[in-house]
Amino acid sequence: MAIKKIRTNDDPVLKRKAKKVTNIDDRLERLLTNMLDTMYEAEGIGLAAPQIGISKRVIVVDIGEDEIYQLINPEIVDTSDEQEKALEGCLSYPGLQGRVTRPVKVTVKALNPQEEEMIIEAEGLLARALQHEIDHLDGITFIDRAEEVFREEESH
C-alpha cells in the first residue's frame, strides 16, 4: 500500500509508551499493511508502529521462516532463564549495531488481525525479534539495552 518514513534516532515517538489498540478496524488493517510494506522495503525483519510515528501497540515480524506475524497489543508473558548475547540492529538506528543480552525463549500473547488471541512460543531469532519490537512499544530501543554500540563496519 504505502511505504512510510521510518523515525530515527532521538525522535520522541521512539521514547514514548505506545497506546493499547482498542478497535480493530480497516484503519488498523491499513496500518499493518503499510508496516509490512515499509519493513520489506527497508529490508528489516521487524517493525513497531512507533517506528513510523504511530503510537499504537502493533508490531510486524518476518524472520524469513513460515509465518509472518502481525501482532496487536503483544505482551511477553514468560521468558527463559537462559540468556544469550547477540548483535542487533534497528531500522531506526541505521548503521549502528549493538550487543544485547536477551532471554533465549519467550512466550508472547497477542491478538491477530482477526481479533483471535495468539500464544507464540518463540526461541532464537524469532524470540529476539519479538522482544526487540515489543521493547519499542514501551519506549525502549536496543541502544538502551546494548552493552556496547558501534557502527556496522566496526563489528568485524
Curated annotation (Swiss-Prot):
EC class name = hydrolase
Q: What is its EC number?
A: 3.5.1.88
Q: What is this protein called?
A: Peptide deformylase
GO molecular-function terms, A-Z: metal ion binding; peptide deformylase activity
Provide the alphabetized UniProt keywords.
Hydrolase, Iron, Metal-binding, Protein biosynthesis
Its organism's taxonomic lineage begins at: Bacteria, Bacillati, Bacillota, Clostridia, Natranaerobiales
Positions annotated as active site in the UniProt record: 133
Query: Taxonomically, which superkingdom?
Result: Bacteria
Please name the source species.
Natranaerobius thermophilus (strain ATCC BAA-1301 / DSM 18059 / JW/NM-WN-LF)
